[in-house]
A protein has these predicted regions:
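Short hydrophobic/aromatic-rich motifs at helix boundaries and adjacent loops
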Residues: 29, 67-68, 98-100
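Conserved alpha-helical substructure of the radical SAM core
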Residues: 49-55, 76-108, 122-126
């Protein structure tokens, strides 16, 4: 790559070289795309991983970007524009259906990207239904975010910050 940049290669040539290098990397080690993919009524539930007995990871499509791209990020496959590598869902009903059927799940990790780039209304559709009695087995909801560091305004001055704090209060009080 360095040589391409030094000799003034075209943007297209540099992108092709980067794609070739990226293609040699394993974006989903340990069979994550095959072995940890949950099924509901015999169908694959896109945008989820049931990686550990008690933990489901959910990748909302609205949270598949970040405030900053960290050099150590192991979720890089979410950002390279290859839909075959990306895990993402917009289907709150499938998330809820799967969690209802799997009472061994006590922890939900909402991840991405960074889910806190989403509007609060999107978080509400995924998380507020979990306050219903049929989800009493869900004890922990984690949101994988670096927004407190990179965009603290999300929690204090963004247009929907008050609604976000209200959602968090409901979840904590439950």
């Amino acid at each position: 790559m360095r040589d391409l940049v030094v000799r003034g290669a075209s943007e297209t040539e540099i992108k092709l070289a980067a794609d070739e290098i990226r293609g040699k990397l394993n974006p989903h080690p340990a069979g994550q795309m095959e072995l940890n993919v949950p099924k509901l009524d015999g169908e694959v539930v896109a945008g989820m991983q049931h990686k550990y007995q008690e933990t489901v990871l959910f990748f909302p499509s609205q949270g598949q970007t970040c405030h900053r791209y960290c050099t150590f990020c192991f979720r890089w496959a979410q950002f390279v524009g290859d839909k075959d590598l990306k895990m993402a869902s917009t289907d709150a009903e499938k998330l809820h259906g799967y969690l209802q059927e799997h009472t061994e799940v006590t922890d939900l990790l909402v991840t991405g990207g960074d889910p806190m780039v989403m509007k609060t209304k999107n978080l509400v559709q995924y998380l507020e239904p979990l306050l219903q009695p049929e989800f009493d087995h869900i004890q922990t909801i984690r949101i994988g975010t670096k927004a407190l560091t990179f965009w603290p305004y999300r929690f204090v001055t963004d247009k929907d910050a008050d609604e976000l704090i209200e959602l968090f209060a409901k979840l904590v009080d439950a």
